[in-house]
Curated annotation (Swiss-Prot):
Any one GO CC term of the record: membrane
UniProt: FMN binding residues: 10-15, 78-80, 113-119, 134
Keyword annotations from UniProtKB, A to Z: Flavoprotein, FMN, NAD, NADP, Nucleotide-binding, Oxidoreductase
Broad class of enzyme this protein falls into: oxidoreductase
Family: Belongs to the WrbA family.
Protein name, per record: NAD(P)H dehydrogenase (quinone)
Entry EC no(s): 1.6.5.2
Superkingdom, taxonomy of origin: Bacteria
Catalytic activity: a quinone + NADH + H(+) = a quinol + NAD(+); a quinone + NADPH + H(+) = a quinol + NADP(+)
NCBIfam families documented for this protein: flav_wrbA, PRK03767.1
Binding site for NAD(+): 12
Length: 199
């Protein structure tokens, strides 16, 4: 049975919610799924003053965890059109795994959130996907079998490069039903691909 890691960073909880939906989809495909987060780098007093969601249930991942999975699905909110520094810092520490080829052939994917419709969703996904390709991973996006990303009837995230959500400038908007459906679809598709490749 394929093992899937949903690895995320979430400052305000939106990506945490998306990560849970991604995991639901992967489990639906029959994979064993773990959800882990990367360490917070912001000092605790600053994080509290900024109303960061610090009470997240997922355990903190270690770099060595990455080698133990057949698929790794990475999610983080955007920071000025790229992945958050917390996720970048974590992935930057994977050089030893990269040097050994320990991630070659694993299945990867990306998901993200932005405050606005044009706040850098695709560039943030690309910043994650670039890392996955350098690691030697097979990247799976959110294909157009998910019709929800074609809708014009509502403001919604979703791109062929990965599932996305919009939060609003004040963070009040939570992932919509359509966005969560996209996250589940991507999780299921990635898990199905991992099962085909790794059993």
């Amino acid at each position: 049975m394929a093992k899937v890691l949903v690895l995320y960073y979430s400052a305000y909880g939106h990506i945490e919610t998306m990560a849970n939906a991604v995991a639901e989809g992967a489990r639906e495909a029959g994979a064993t799924v773990d959800i882990k987060r990367v360490p917070e780098l912001v000092p605790p007093d600053v994080a509290k003053a900024s109303y960061y969601k610090l009470d997240q249930a997922a355990p903190v991942a270690t770099i060595d965890d990455l080698a133990n999975y057949d698929a790794i699905i990475v999610g983080t909110g955007t920071r000025f059109g790229r992945m958050a520094s917390q996720m970048a810092n974590f992935l930057d520490q994977a050089g030893g795994l990269w040097a050994k080829g320990a991630l070659n052939g694993k299945v990867g994917g990306a998901f993200t959130s932005t405050a606005t419709q044009h706040g850098g969703q695709e560039t943030t996904l690309f910043s994650i996907i670039t890392n996955l390709l350098h690691f030697g991973m097979v990247v799976v996006g959110l294909n157009y079998g998910f019709q929800g990303q074609m809708t014009l009837g509502e403001i919604t995230g979703g791109a062929p490069y990965g599932a996305t959500t919009l939060t609003g400038g004040d963070g009040a908007r939570q992932p919509s039903a359509n966005e969560l459906a996209g996250a589940r679809y991507q999780g299921k598709t990635i898990a199905e691909t991992a099962i085909k490749l790794h059993g």
